[in-house]
Amino acid sequence: FLRKQQLAKLDELVKARFVEMFGDFKSNSKGWSIVKFDEFAQIDGNMTTDYKKYADYPHIGIDSIEKGTGALKGYRTVKEDGVVSGKYIFTPQHIIYSKIRPNLNKVALPDFEGLCSADAYPILPNPKNCNRIFLALAMRSDYFLDYILQFSARTNLPKVNRKEIAGFSMPLPPLSLQNDFSTFVERVDQQKQTVQQSLEKLELMKKALMQEYFG
């Protein structure tokens, strides 16, 4: 329980650092230039049906993206999932954004290549003015959620389209500052990994003891 609390606190630390460095996006308290989506990123519609070529690549369905944190869990390969429909190609340069039920806030940062469900968009930040980690955190923020949820409330199955994402604008701080924030997030992620590993070790020990005494 304590370790789970530690993980939650580390997530809060990142959010607090975001506001500290970039201000409140809603009021744009630091007076950054407001920039349109297509000036700092693009939706990369590079799709494939070549399942032989990508057979051993990871296949990311939207169920593999944890809500809120964007952690990638429980995914399998393209071959294991028996993929039959067109999928988007992504790389470690992309953000994977689930366009279904945007209130679940599924924004992932893959560190590998693979294919993702057509229910998600691979988003490619413009490296000249936008850091990938910064953009992912901006997309997980209330600022982006408040914008995107106004469209999805109209349907039974809430879904976001390209046009709606393309209509998004946000304050864009200097790239050097975004990069500083990104370095901070990476350091926190390393700490999270350490906590996560100790959680998994504890779980294994618990199972072994249960087996020994009650198996």
Identify the function of each model-found stretch:
Residues F1, V83-V84, R154, Q193:
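Short, solvent-exposed loop/turn positions at domain surfaces
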Residues K30-S33, D50-P58, F151-S152:
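Short coil/turn segments at secondary-structure boundaries
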Residues D38-T49, P58-P92:
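Sequence-specific dsDNA recognition surfaces
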Residues L2-T48, G167, P171-N179, E186-G215:
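Non-catalytic DNA-recognition/assembly elements of restriction-modification systems
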Residues G86-Y88, P92-L145, N161-R162:
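A short beta-sheet element
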Residues I62, L109-P110, P125, M170-L172:
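Hydrophobic residues in beta-strands and at strand termini
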Residues L7, V14-K15, I34, K53, ...:
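Alpha-helix initiation and N-capping motif
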Residues I100, G114-Y121, A153-N179:
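A short glycine-rich beta-alpha junction/loop motif
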